[in-house]
Amino acid sequence: MAKLQITLKRSLIGRTVDQQDTVKALGLRKINSTVVKEDNPAIRGMVFKVKHLVEVKEVEA
């Protein structure tokens, strides 16, 4: 199964609380921090919500 490599590229300053909570739930804290998550609809939805703040790459498991 494929995985998603998610990197925080933009600051959370001035963003809505909802967007901040979504980034925190993805496990991202600082700019350029990266996490690898399973590719599933829940994670895709979270990424879509903050797509302007993150960079996503698909990686093989």
Swiss-Prot record:
Q: Which GO terms describe its molecular function?
A: structural constituent of ribosome
NCBIfam families referenced in this protein's UniProt entry, alphabetically: rpmD_bact
Disulfide pairs? none
Pfam families hit by this protein: Ribosomal_L30
Q: Which UniProt keywords apply?
A: Ribonucleoprotein, Ribosomal protein
Choose any GO biological process term that the UniProt entry carries and state it. translation
Under the subunit heading, UniProt states: Part of the 50S ribosomal subunit.
Q: Which InterPro entries match?
A: Ribo_uL30_ferredoxin-like_sf (IPR036919), Ribosomal_uL30_bac-type (IPR005996), Ribosomal_uL30_CS (IPR018038), Ribosomal_uL30_ferredoxin-like (IPR016082)
The record, for SUPFAM superfamilies, names: Ribosomal protein L30p/L7e
Is Ribonucleoprotein there in the keyword field? yes
By sequence similarity, the record places it as follows:
Belongs to the universal ribosomal protein uL30 family.
- Protein name according to UniProt: Large ribosomal subunit protein uL30
Task: Work out whether the entry's keyword set contains Iron-sulfur.
Answer: no
What's a GO cellular component annotated to this UniProt protein? cytosolic large ribosomal subunit
